[in-house]
Every structure is written in structure tokens, then in C-alpha cells.
């Protein structure tokens, strides 16, 4: 089986200013990807898979999105992370789920965050769901 620990496009801006994250670390069962920015300004993704019970696997996914700004120190402009947004997702799948079952779960996650759907629309507008 091929490794899933590969670089991928996290933010697709149509090829202009895309954010790509690359494998950075794998320790204690936690995979980490970061963008090429300095660590303090980098986009960061972590993922772990644990056996949460005798019958379930639990995937924990975390994404950090920095707001990069410029700070002037002694007349020199330096990029800094002004703040960060965090996404935390947990997914529990029974160990007896088939590959087809798991593919359906992935499609549901993709549909959940598809442009135009209520949740990403509310997030993009920094508003509530009503």
C-alpha cells in the first residue's frame, strides 16, 4: 500500500497563490504537514488514527490557518502571524466498515464543505446559520 504521507494542496486558489503543505514530522502516531512559510506563519495540518475502542477507529484532524500581517521593527517590515483560525475534526469509523463505506464517508465530508452549501457559506461570510 502506498504511503498517504505526501504533500498536498490545502488551499486551492486556482493555481495562483495556492497553499501546499508538505510532510514535516511523524511522531507517536501523529502526522504533521506544514506550508513552506516559517513555522510561526505556516499553515499546519495534523492527523492521527487511534483505536478508540475494540470496535472503532478514531481519526483526529486539526488545521491551523494563520492570518499573516506585516510588523515594522526598527524600520524593517517583518511578516508575522497576527492571529490563527483552528479547525478540529473527529471522525469515528467502525473497524468492520468496508472500503466502500469509508469512501462514502469521505464523499459526505467533501459535500459538507462544498462551495455554496450552508456551512461553508456561513464560515466564508463570518456569520451564523439561519
UniProtKB/Swiss-Prot annotation:
One of its GO terms (molecular function) is RNA binding. GO terms for biological process: negative regulation of viral translation; regulation of translation. It is found in: Virion. Keywords: Capsid protein, RNA-binding, T=3 icosahedral capsid protein, Translation regulation, Virion. InterPro entries: Levivir_coat, Phage_RNA-type_capsid. The keyword Ribosomal protein does not apply. Capsid protein self-assembles to form an icosahedral capsid with a T=3 symmetry, about 26 nm in diameter, and consisting of 89 capsid proteins dimers (178 capsid proteins). Involved in viral genome encapsidation through the interaction between a capsid protein dimer and the multiple packaging signals present in the RNA genome. The capsid also contains 1 copy of the A2 maturation protein. Belongs to the Leviviricetes capsid protein family. This is Capsid protein. It comes from Escherichia phage MS2. The lineage of its organism: Viruses, Riboviria, Orthornavirae, Lenarviricota, Leviviricetes.
Amino acid at each position: 500500500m502506498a504511503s498517504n504521507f505526501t504533500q498536498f494542496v490545502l488551499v486551492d486558489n486556482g493555481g495562483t497563490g495556492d497553499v501546499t503543505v508538505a510532510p514535516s514530522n511523524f511522531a507517536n502516531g501523529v502526522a504533521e504537514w506544514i506550508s513552506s512559510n516559517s513555522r510561526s506563519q505556516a499553515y499546519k495540518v495534523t492527523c492521527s488514527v487511534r483505536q478508540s475502542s475494540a470496535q472503532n477507529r478514531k481519526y483526529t484532524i486539526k488545521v491551523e490557518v494563520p492570518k499573516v500581517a506585516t510588523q515594522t521593527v526598527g524600520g524593517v517590515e517583518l511578516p508575522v502571524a497576527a492571529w490563527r483560525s483552528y479547525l478540529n475534526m473527529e471522525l469515528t469509523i467502525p473497524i468492520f466498515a468496508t472500503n466502500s463505506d469509508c469512501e462514502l464517508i469521505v464523499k459526505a465530508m467533501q459535500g459538507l464543505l462544498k462551495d455554496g452549501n450552508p456551512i461553508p457559506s456561513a464560515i466564508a461570510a463570518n456569520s451564523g446559520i439561519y
